[in-house]
Amino acid sequence: MIVDLESRVTDLETRLAFQDDTIQALNDVLVEQQRLVERLQLQLVALAKRQEEMQGSLGAADEDEAPPPHY
């Protein structure tokens, strides 16, 4: 009876140790993914700003041009 309980406690302690390791590994991956998401968000904002600037400069150039002769 005592041996069985000791075995069960040892098994539970082993499982707990593996669960702690798994939780830490998952947390590390989550932190890495969050950093990646933040970098991607910054890149997206920069690309959107760049696109707006390019569209603005193209729009201004189009307004200065005379209409084609068929108008």
From Swiss-Prot:
It comes from Stutzerimonas stutzeri (strain A1501). Belongs to the SlyX family. NCBIfam families: PRK00295.1. Gene3D superfamilies: 1.20.5.300. This is Protein SlyX homolog. InterPro entries: SlyX. PANTHER family: PROTEIN SLYX. The gene is slyX.
